[in-house]
């Protein structure tokens, strides 16, 4: 879990056998473990784990392998058509950041859907590569899109939950849900604290609301609302809760924290080992949403 006992000493190196342990990747354990050195166990770690769900570390080498490079004859028509939905009177910058990130991440065509009332302001501030449309005619807005990312700056007014539901009902392609789109969903599941405390994995999480297959990108506060559980509990059972959520809802969960992790529907969890404190600034999550949409 990464939790440490009172009085735990800090080390320069920790030798671990077979494979790196989760507690050395999660704070505060990572802060006292120093540099982790993996020593041979005498058998492949896959055999030791058997059929259990696995946790994988993301480093620069793995990230490079996963990047989908453009073919030499590529043009905008084959590089994807992305739609970003967001924005409100008080939050104009968030959807702009997301849309521009999608452009810089390789999407061939990017359209930003915002409320009609802020459309002129957005058009005057965004880079010219991004087309801007109104969310009022959202069915036409969705036509031809190969990925839709929704949430940055969307707002939390009373009409937003119905708007989010209408998009989810109307669009059948790849989805990225972030920020206020996640807030609009409310509590989608519940956690049995006793089962979590006792390690009864099969009984930990119960689904209250079905979700479409999508990528969800909550920070700890947003995840706390989704599963109706205090943040302090999430911090103690970080990987377990992310894994069970992704498996139960059959979604891809990008849980933003220290470290950020990616949980897949099959139970595999990827832990990011290369994040840094420089990411702790406003708008970083909006950019991530756009990057994910661009990669899709």
Q: Positions of the model-derived regions?
A:
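A conserved, positively charged/aromatic
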Residues: 7-9
């Amino acid at each position: 879990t990464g939790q440490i006992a009172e009085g735990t000493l800090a080390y320069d190196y920790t030798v671990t056998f077979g494979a790196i342990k989760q507690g050395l990747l999660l704070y505060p354990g990572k802060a006292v473990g120093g540099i982790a050195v993996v020593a041979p166990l005498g058998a492949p770690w896959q055999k030791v784990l058997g059929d259990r769900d696995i946790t994988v570390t993301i480093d620069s080498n793995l990230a490079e392998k996963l990047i989908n490079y453009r073919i030499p004859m590529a043009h905008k028509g084959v590089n994807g058509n992305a739609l970003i939905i967001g924005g409100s009177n008080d939050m104009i910058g968030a959807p702009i950041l997301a849309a521009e990130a999608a452009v810089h991440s390789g999407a061939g065509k990017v359209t930003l859907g915002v409320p009609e009332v802020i459309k002129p302001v957005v058009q005057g501030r965004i880079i010219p590569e991004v087309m801007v449309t109104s969310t009022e005619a959202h069915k036409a807005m969705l036509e031809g899109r190969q990925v839709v990312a929704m949430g940055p700056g969307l707002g939390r007014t009373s009409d937003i939950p119905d708007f989010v539901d209408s998009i989810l009902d109307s669009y059948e392609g790849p989805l990225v849900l972030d920020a206020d789109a996640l807030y609009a969903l409310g509590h989608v599941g519940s956690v049995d604290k006793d089962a979590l405390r006792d390690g009864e994995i099969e009984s930990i999480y119960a689904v209250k609301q079905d979700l479409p297959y999508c990528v969800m990108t909550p920070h700890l506060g947003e995840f706390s609302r989704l599963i109706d559980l205090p943040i302090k509990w999430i911090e103690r059972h970080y990987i377990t809760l992310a894994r069970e959520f992704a498996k139960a809802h059959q979604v891809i969960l990008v849980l933003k924290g220290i470290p950020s992790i990616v949980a897949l529907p099959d139970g595999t969890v990827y832990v990011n080992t290369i994040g840094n404190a420089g990411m702790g600034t406003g708008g970083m999550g909006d950019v991530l949403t756009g990057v994910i949409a661009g990669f899709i």
